[in-house]
Amino acid sequence: MLGALLLGGCDRQSAEPAQPAEAPQAAAPAATGTIDRSFAGRIMPAADLTAPGGATLSLAATRGKPVLLNLWATWCVPCVTEMPLLNQLAADYDGRLAVLTVSEDLQGEEKVVPFFEQRDLANLPRWMDEKNDLAVAFGGGAALPLTVLYDAQGREVWRVIGGYDWAGATARQAIDSAL
């Protein structure tokens, strides 16, 4: 059931099937996400992430530094479109903001490893939410991409549902004002 909710939730803006063999290389869809502060103050969900090869990260261990948490999937067109923008954002804010990209792909490592191998995303981590704990924590049917900014104490500042221009001045101003 949860998988069906996730598959249906992606703000794909495309007539493509929800889970094609690989993300299409067509023109990028327009960014539709907007900053939503209505969840401000909520505590970061408790979840353990896994990296290819088996390393783990407890989200609780990220406290002490602001975190931009991005839930994405290889089959989600806006997710794939914003990955290079998030990669540059991670480089630009290195040391001041942790950018955590977390795959919600049901096939986990099987999809995530080739995705990263085919792209130059050296500044982004390859975390996976294998049990979909984060998807459940954000309501079970959360649309992808979902990006949430947390302050150093692990409290939500704002979130964006849908594709977003992470290279734009609005994004940078919203991040800078929260750091």
Question: Model-derived features: where do they sit?
Answer:
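Structural microenvironment flanking redox-active thiols in thiol-disulfide oxidoreductases
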Residues: 81-120, 130-137
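Hydrophobic beta-strand positions
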Residues: 48-49, 149
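Active-site acidic short loop of glycosyltransferases
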Residues: 63-65, 95, 121-123
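Short active-site neighborhood of thiol/selenol oxidoreductases, capturing the structured segment around
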Residues: 58-80
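Thiol/disulfide oxidoreductase modules built on the thioredoxin-like
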Residues: 116-123, 128-178
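N-terminal targeting signals for export/organelle localization
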Residues: 1-46, 179
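Alpha/beta-hydrolase fold active-site loops
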Residues: 66-67, 97, 145, 155
